[in-house]
Amino acid sequence: FIKTLSTTTTPEGTRIDSYTQTRNYYLKVDYTTPVGKGGSFEVGGKADFNNNVIPNSYFNLSNNDWVFDNTKSNNFKYSDNINALYANFSKTFFEKLETRIGLRYEYIRFKLRQDVGNIEKTTSYGRFLPNLLVKYSFNSNYDLSLTYNHNLWRPWYSEFNPFLMPNNDGIYTQGNMDLLPNPSDRVVLKFGLFKKYFISARYMFTDQDYWTNYKEEDGKMISFPDNFKGKVEKFYLFANTNQNFLKNKLNVNFGLGWYYIDNSDFNIRNGLSRDNNYISYIGGSTNLSYTNLFN
Protein backbone atom coordinates (compact mmCIF):
# COMPACT_ATOMS: atom_id res chain seq x y z
CA PHE A 1 0.00 0.00 0.00
CA ILE A 2 0.99 3.66 -0.28
CA LYS A 3 1.02 5.76 2.86
CA THR A 4 2.30 9.27 3.44
CA LEU A 5 4.29 9.27 6.66
CA SER A 6 4.66 12.21 9.00
CA THR A 7 8.20 13.55 9.41
CA THR A 8 7.44 15.09 12.80
CA THR A 9 10.10 13.94 15.24
CA THR A 10 9.77 13.16 18.91
CA PRO A 11 9.78 16.50 20.80
CA GLU A 12 13.06 17.46 22.39
CA GLY A 13 12.95 17.18 26.13
CA THR A 14 11.67 13.61 26.17
CA ARG A 15 13.77 10.69 27.40
CA ILE A 16 12.93 6.99 27.61
CA ASP A 17 15.05 4.55 29.60
CA SER A 18 14.47 0.97 28.46
CA TYR A 19 16.48 -2.13 29.31
CA THR A 20 15.93 -5.83 29.93
CA GLN A 21 16.16 -8.06 32.99
CA THR A 22 16.52 -11.74 32.10
CA ARG A 23 16.57 -14.95 34.12
CA ASN A 24 16.88 -18.44 32.66
CA TYR A 25 16.80 -21.84 34.39
CA TYR A 26 16.78 -25.22 32.71
CA LEU A 27 17.09 -28.92 33.43
CA LYS A 28 18.27 -31.32 30.73
CA VAL A 29 18.52 -35.12 30.69
CA ASP A 30 19.89 -37.28 27.83
CA TYR A 31 20.30 -41.03 27.48
CA THR A 32 21.92 -43.02 24.65
CA THR A 33 22.17 -46.78 24.23
CA PRO A 34 23.41 -49.03 21.39
CA VAL A 35 20.80 -51.07 19.52
CA GLY A 36 22.03 -54.11 17.62
CA LYS A 37 24.87 -53.77 15.13
CA GLY A 38 25.48 -50.21 13.96
CA GLY A 39 22.40 -48.80 15.68
CA SER A 40 21.77 -46.43 18.56
CA PHE A 41 18.76 -45.00 20.34
CA GLU A 42 18.78 -41.61 22.03
CA VAL A 43 16.08 -40.11 24.19
CA GLY A 44 16.01 -36.99 26.31
CA GLY A 45 14.11 -34.08 27.66
CA LYS A 46 14.55 -30.48 28.68
CA ALA A 47 12.57 -28.13 30.92
CA ASP A 48 13.30 -24.47 30.27
CA PHE A 49 12.09 -21.56 32.41
CA ASN A 50 12.49 -17.91 31.39
CA ASN A 51 11.53 -14.75 33.22
CA ASN A 52 12.05 -11.41 31.44
CA VAL A 53 11.15 -7.85 32.39
CA ILE A 54 11.43 -4.73 30.21
CA PRO A 55 11.01 -1.55 32.27
CA ASN A 56 10.19 1.51 30.13
CA SER A 57 10.64 4.73 32.09
CA TYR A 58 9.39 7.96 30.50
CA PHE A 59 10.91 11.34 31.48
CA ASN A 60 10.06 14.93 30.53
CA LEU A 61 12.53 17.79 30.67
CA SER A 62 11.32 20.52 33.03
CA ASN A 63 13.49 23.39 34.26
CA ASN A 64 16.62 21.52 33.17
CA ASP A 65 15.61 18.47 35.24
CA TRP A 66 14.34 15.10 34.06
CA VAL A 67 10.96 14.47 35.65
CA PHE A 68 9.58 10.93 35.73
CA ASP A 69 6.19 10.62 33.97
CA ASN A 70 4.24 7.81 35.59
CA THR A 71 1.33 8.16 33.14
CA LYS A 72 3.49 7.13 30.15
CA SER A 73 5.92 4.70 31.83
CA ASN A 74 5.30 0.98 31.84
CA ASN A 75 6.73 -2.41 32.79
CA PHE A 76 6.37 -5.35 30.41
CA LYS A 77 6.79 -8.83 31.90
CA TYR A 78 7.24 -12.07 29.99
CA SER A 79 7.60 -15.54 31.51
CA ASP A 80 7.52 -18.93 29.84
CA ASN A 81 8.02 -22.63 30.44
CA ILE A 82 9.15 -24.76 27.49
CA ASN A 83 9.12 -28.54 27.97
CA ALA A 84 10.60 -30.75 25.27
CA LEU A 85 10.90 -34.51 24.78
CA TYR A 86 12.80 -36.09 21.92
CA ALA A 87 13.79 -39.50 20.58
CA ASN A 88 16.25 -40.38 17.80
CA PHE A 89 17.07 -43.73 16.24
CA SER A 90 20.22 -44.06 14.13
CA LYS A 91 21.52 -47.04 12.20
CA THR A 92 24.30 -47.66 9.69
CA PHE A 93 23.86 -50.35 7.03
CA PHE A 94 26.81 -52.15 5.39
CA GLU A 95 29.13 -49.33 6.52
CA LYS A 96 27.89 -47.03 3.75
CA LEU A 97 24.31 -46.01 4.44
CA GLU A 98 23.68 -43.83 7.50
CA THR A 99 20.10 -43.24 8.62
CA ARG A 100 18.51 -41.28 11.42
CA ILE A 101 14.90 -40.63 12.23
CA GLY A 102 13.84 -38.39 15.07
CA LEU A 103 10.82 -36.83 16.67
CA ARG A 104 10.71 -33.93 19.09
CA TYR A 105 7.69 -32.61 20.95
CA GLU A 106 7.72 -29.12 22.42
CA TYR A 107 5.09 -27.59 24.65
CA ILE A 108 5.26 -23.94 25.65
CA ARG A 109 3.18 -21.95 28.07
CA PHE A 110 3.90 -18.25 28.31
CA LYS A 111 2.42 -15.29 30.12
CA LEU A 112 2.48 -11.64 29.04
CA ARG A 113 1.70 -8.79 31.38
CA GLN A 114 1.67 -5.02 31.01
CA ASP A 115 1.41 -3.04 34.24
CA VAL A 116 -0.41 -0.07 32.70
CA GLY A 117 -4.02 -1.07 32.21
CA ASN A 118 -3.30 -4.38 33.96
CA ILE A 119 -3.30 -6.15 30.58
CA GLU A 120 -2.49 -9.85 30.86
CA LYS A 121 -2.49 -12.76 28.44
CA THR A 122 -1.61 -16.44 28.85
CA THR A 123 -1.08 -18.73 25.86
CA SER A 124 0.01 -22.34 25.41
CA TYR A 125 0.52 -24.71 22.49
CA GLY A 126 2.39 -27.88 21.57
CA ARG A 127 4.06 -28.99 18.34
CA PHE A 128 5.62 -32.18 16.94
CA LEU A 129 8.92 -31.53 15.13
CA PRO A 130 10.10 -34.52 13.05
CA ASN A 131 13.50 -34.83 11.36
CA LEU A 132 15.09 -37.32 8.98
CA LEU A 133 18.60 -38.01 7.64
CA VAL A 134 19.74 -40.46 4.95
CA LYS A 135 23.39 -40.39 3.89
CA TYR A 136 25.18 -42.72 1.48
CA SER A 137 28.98 -42.78 1.20
CA PHE A 138 30.11 -44.12 -2.17
CA ASN A 139 33.71 -44.10 -0.91
CA SER A 140 35.92 -41.90 1.24
CA ASN A 141 35.72 -39.08 -1.32
CA TYR A 142 32.05 -38.98 -2.38
CA ASP A 143 28.84 -38.93 -0.37
CA LEU A 144 25.20 -37.96 -0.90
CA SER A 145 22.80 -36.95 1.87
CA LEU A 146 19.13 -36.05 2.20
CA THR A 147 17.75 -34.26 5.27
CA TYR A 148 14.29 -33.10 6.29
CA ASN A 149 13.37 -30.87 9.23
CA HIS A 150 10.15 -29.36 10.49
CA ASN A 151 11.02 -26.24 12.48
CA LEU A 152 9.20 -23.68 14.58
CA TRP A 153 10.36 -20.09 14.91
CA ARG A 154 8.99 -18.32 17.98
CA PRO A 155 8.78 -14.54 18.30
CA TRP A 156 11.39 -12.96 20.56
CA TYR A 157 9.87 -11.90 23.88
CA SER A 158 10.51 -8.18 23.26
CA GLU A 159 8.41 -8.39 20.07
CA PHE A 160 5.33 -8.89 22.28
CA ASN A 161 5.98 -5.65 24.21
CA PRO A 162 3.05 -3.24 23.53
CA PHE A 163 4.91 -0.17 24.86
CA LEU A 164 4.74 2.70 22.34
CA MET A 165 8.34 3.74 21.62
CA PRO A 166 8.93 7.00 19.68
CA ASN A 167 11.67 7.11 17.05
CA ASN A 168 13.61 10.09 15.74
CA ASP A 169 11.93 9.84 12.32
CA GLY A 170 8.48 10.52 13.74
CA ILE A 171 7.32 6.90 13.51
CA TYR A 172 6.50 4.97 16.67
CA THR A 173 7.24 1.27 17.19
CA GLN A 174 5.15 -1.16 19.18
CA GLY A 175 5.08 -4.90 19.87
CA ASN A 176 2.15 -7.23 19.33
CA MET A 177 0.83 -9.49 22.09
CA ASP A 178 -1.01 -11.63 19.49
CA LEU A 179 2.02 -12.78 17.48
CA LEU A 180 1.96 -16.41 16.34
CA PRO A 181 4.89 -18.83 15.88
CA ASN A 182 6.18 -19.42 12.36
CA PRO A 183 6.39 -23.10 11.27
CA SER A 184 8.55 -24.11 8.31
CA ASP A 185 9.65 -27.26 6.48
CA ARG A 186 13.04 -27.75 4.86
CA VAL A 187 14.47 -30.45 2.57
CA VAL A 188 18.17 -30.46 1.64
CA LEU A 189 19.94 -32.71 -0.90
CA LYS A 190 23.72 -32.41 -0.58
CA PHE A 191 26.59 -33.94 -2.55
CA GLY A 192 30.10 -33.89 -1.05
CA LEU A 193 33.37 -34.30 -2.93
CA PHE A 194 36.71 -34.99 -1.23
CA LYS A 195 35.25 -33.54 1.98
CA LYS A 196 36.10 -30.09 0.61
CA TYR A 197 33.54 -29.31 -2.08
CA PHE A 198 29.78 -29.38 -1.60
CA ILE A 199 26.83 -28.94 -3.95
CA SER A 200 23.36 -28.68 -2.43
CA ALA A 201 19.76 -28.20 -3.52
CA ARG A 202 17.37 -26.85 -0.88
CA TYR A 203 13.62 -26.42 -0.70
CA MET A 204 11.82 -24.62 2.11
CA PHE A 205 8.25 -23.46 2.61
CA THR A 206 6.09 -21.84 5.25
CA ASP A 207 2.36 -21.09 5.42
CA GLN A 208 2.51 -18.10 7.74
CA ASP A 209 4.95 -15.55 9.04
CA TYR A 210 5.06 -12.21 10.78
CA TRP A 211 6.35 -9.00 9.23
CA THR A 212 6.29 -5.27 9.89
CA ASN A 213 2.89 -3.64 9.48
CA TYR A 214 1.69 -0.05 9.97
CA LYS A 215 -1.30 1.59 11.59
CA GLU A 216 -2.34 5.12 12.51
CA GLU A 217 -3.70 5.96 15.95
CA ASP A 218 -4.35 9.44 17.37
CA GLY A 219 -2.33 11.02 14.57
CA LYS A 220 0.67 8.75 15.21
CA MET A 221 2.10 6.40 12.60
CA ILE A 222 2.99 3.13 14.34
CA SER A 223 5.02 0.20 13.01
CA PHE A 224 4.46 -3.19 14.61
CA PRO A 225 5.01 -6.91 13.85
CA ASP A 226 1.87 -8.56 12.53
CA ASN A 227 0.75 -12.05 11.49
CA PHE A 228 0.40 -12.77 7.78
CA LYS A 229 -1.05 -15.92 6.26
CA GLY A 230 0.12 -17.24 2.92
CA LYS A 231 2.55 -19.74 1.48
CA VAL A 232 6.13 -18.80 0.60
CA GLU A 233 8.37 -21.29 -1.22
CA LYS A 234 12.14 -20.98 -1.54
CA PHE A 235 14.46 -22.95 -3.82
CA TYR A 236 18.25 -22.79 -3.54
CA LEU A 237 21.12 -24.25 -5.57
CA PHE A 238 24.37 -23.73 -3.73
CA ALA A 239 28.03 -24.68 -4.14
CA ASN A 240 30.69 -24.04 -1.55
CA THR A 241 34.14 -25.12 -0.50
CA ASN A 242 35.97 -25.03 2.81
CA GLN A 243 39.74 -25.53 2.70
CA ASN A 244 42.84 -25.03 4.82
CA PHE A 245 46.25 -23.88 3.58
CA LEU A 246 49.68 -23.09 5.02
CA LYS A 247 49.64 -25.96 7.48
CA ASN A 248 46.04 -25.22 8.51
CA LYS A 249 46.82 -21.59 9.38
CA LEU A 250 44.75 -20.14 6.53
CA ASN A 251 41.09 -21.14 6.25
CA VAL A 252 39.13 -20.26 3.10
CA ASN A 253 35.35 -20.64 2.79
CA PHE A 254 33.70 -19.64 -0.47
CA GLY A 255 30.13 -20.14 -1.62
CA LEU A 256 28.01 -19.25 -4.65
CA GLY A 257 24.30 -19.87 -5.05
CA TRP A 258 21.16 -19.26 -7.08
CA TYR A 259 18.03 -18.36 -5.15
CA TYR A 260 14.41 -18.49 -6.29
CA ILE A 261 11.50 -17.33 -4.11
CA ASP A 262 7.80 -17.80 -4.89
CA ASN A 263 5.72 -15.21 -3.00
CA SER A 264 2.64 -15.42 -5.23
CA ASP A 265 0.24 -17.01 -2.73
CA PHE A 266 1.47 -14.77 0.10
CA ASN A 267 1.07 -11.60 -1.97
CA ILE A 268 -2.40 -12.50 -3.25
CA ARG A 269 -3.77 -13.40 0.19
CA ASN A 270 -2.43 -10.21 1.74
CA GLY A 271 -3.30 -7.82 -1.07
CA LEU A 272 0.32 -7.00 -1.88
CA SER A 273 1.82 -5.99 -5.19
CA ARG A 274 2.27 -8.87 -7.61
CA ASP A 275 5.42 -7.34 -9.08
CA ASN A 276 7.44 -9.36 -6.57
CA ASN A 277 5.56 -12.65 -6.89
CA TYR A 278 8.70 -14.36 -8.15
CA ILE A 279 12.21 -13.33 -7.16
CA SER A 280 15.46 -14.87 -8.35
CA TYR A 281 19.03 -13.77 -7.81
CA ILE A 282 22.60 -15.00 -7.51
CA GLY A 283 24.46 -14.52 -4.25
CA GLY A 284 27.89 -15.35 -2.97
CA SER A 285 29.90 -15.25 0.22
CA THR A 286 33.49 -15.67 1.25
CA ASN A 287 35.35 -15.86 4.53
CA LEU A 288 39.10 -15.84 5.10
CA SER A 289 40.73 -16.44 8.47
CA TYR A 290 44.39 -16.71 9.38
CA THR A 291 45.69 -18.08 12.67
CA ASN A 292 49.28 -17.64 13.75
CA LEU A 293 49.78 -18.29 17.46
CA PHE A 294 53.24 -17.27 18.67
CA ASN A 295 54.79 -18.27 15.37
Feature annotation, model-predicted:
Residues F1-L193, Y197-N295:
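Primarily recognizes Gram-negative and organellar outer-membrane beta-barrels
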